[in-house]
């Protein structure tokens, strides 16, 4: 199909100008008539001192905006702006008086101490051992712990003394009685008594039979003997 011809938009006509106001007032009922202003009040004016009006402004911001951001001039040697150069910020950076403290210093307990930096290849070749587990810390030697990049430093906790002396003082009969009492207490708790049975289980020979005929077994047997009831009528559709 040939392309459609582009129609020129009709030029907007200028609004009609009325040299005289309507004699009967505004045509719309919702519009209110404007009364001439007759009562005017004269308020004493105070001259503005431009030297003191900006006295509270910081001197860093006294520079005019035009000097910082000159107006863009079109068609002015675009080849110069093709290669962008790193520009420095026109405003100074903010400086903080006190350095920010890390979260570990606020806690007061150094949990992890970083060892001297090592290459990533050496660290990746080593076997993965959970350093923070107490069993691995007990089995590993001091040199192996020092060779790892991160070492767990446990807090100062007093370990209890060995109870070998106390075990010698306890007789053998008392030990056996305590073991029997522990096994009795740690057994499975007594299960609560079952409540009343709300719905009985369906026997296997009645699976697939509709509830209506399951409750009327004598009627179901009578109709099946007479051949007046098909299987699709009393069996559940699967």
UniProtKB/Swiss-Prot annotation:
One of its GO terms (molecular function) is chromatin-protein adaptor activity. One of its GO terms (cellular component) is nucleus. A motif (D-box) lies at residues 125-132. Weakly expressed in testis, prostate, ovary, thymus and small intestine. Expressed strongly in breast cancer cells. Residues 1-31, 74-105 are annotated as: Disordered. Pfam families: RHINO (PF15319). Residues 1-10, 75-84 have a biased composition (Basic residues). Keywords: Cell cycle, Chromosome, DNA damage, DNA repair, Nucleus, Phosphoprotein, Ubl conjugation. Induction: Up-regulated in breast cancer cells. The modification Phosphoserine is found at residue 51. It is found in: Nucleus; Chromosome. GO terms for biological process: cellular response to ionizing radiation; cellular response to UV; DNA damage checkpoint signaling; double-strand break repair via alternative nonhomologous end joining; positive regulation of G0 to G1 transition; protein localization to site of double-strand break; recombinational repair. Phosphorylated at Ser-51 by PLK1, promoting interaction with polymerase theta (POLQ). Ubiquitinated and degraded by the APC/C complex upon mitotic exit. A motif (RAD1-binding motif) lies at residues 55-61. The keyword Ubl conjugation applies. A motif (KEN box) lies at residues 174-178. InterPro entries: RHNO1 (IPR029293). The RAD1-binding motif mediates interaction with RAD1. Involved in microhomology-mediated end-joining (MMEJ) DNA repair by promoting recruitment of polymerase theta (POLQ) to DNA damage sites during mitosis. MMEJ is an alternative non-homologous end-joining (NHEJ) machinery that takes place during mitosis to repair double-strand breaks in DNA that originate in S-phase. Accumulates in M-phase; following phosphorylation by PLK1, interacts with POLQ, enabling its recruitment to double-strand breaks for subsequent repair. Interacts (when phosphorylated by PLK1) with POLQ; promoting POLQ recruitment to DNA damage sites. Interacts with RAD1; interaction is direct and promotes association with the 9-1-1 (RAD9-RAD1-HUS1) complex. Interacts with RAD18. Interacts with TOPBP1. Interacts with UBE2N. This is RAD9, HUS1, RAD1-interacting nuclear orphan protein 1. It comes from Homo sapiens.
């Amino acid at each position: 199909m040939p392309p459609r011809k582009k129609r020129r938009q009709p030029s907007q006509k200028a609004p009609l100008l009325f040299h005289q106001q309507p004699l009967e007032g505004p045509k719309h009922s919702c519009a209110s008539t404007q009364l001439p202003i007759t009562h005017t009040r004269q308020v004493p004016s105070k001259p503005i001192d431009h030297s003191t009006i900006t006295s509270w402004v910081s001197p860093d911001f006294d520079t005019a905006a035009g000097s910082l951001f000159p107006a863009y001039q079109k068609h002015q040697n675009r080849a110069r702006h093709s290669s962008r150069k790193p520009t420095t910020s026109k405003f100074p950076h903010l400086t903080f008086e006190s350095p920010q403290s890390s979260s570990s210093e606020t806690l007061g307990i150094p949990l992890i101490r970083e060892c001297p930096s090592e290459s990533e290849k050496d660290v990746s070749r080593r076997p993965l051992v959970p350093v923070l587990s107490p069993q691995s810390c007990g089995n590993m030697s001091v040199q192996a712990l020092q060779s790892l990049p991160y070492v767990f430093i446990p807090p100062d906790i007093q370990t209890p003394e060995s109870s070998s002396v106390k075990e010698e003082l306890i007789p053998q009969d008392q030990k056996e009685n305590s073991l029997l009492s522990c096994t009795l207490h740690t057994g499975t708790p007594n299960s609560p008594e079952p409540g009343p049975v709300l719905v009985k289980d369906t026997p296997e020979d009645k699976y697939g039979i509709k509830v209506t005929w399951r409750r009327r077994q004598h009627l179901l047997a009578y109709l099946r003997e007479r051949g007046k009831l098909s299987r699709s009528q009393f069996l559940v559709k699967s």
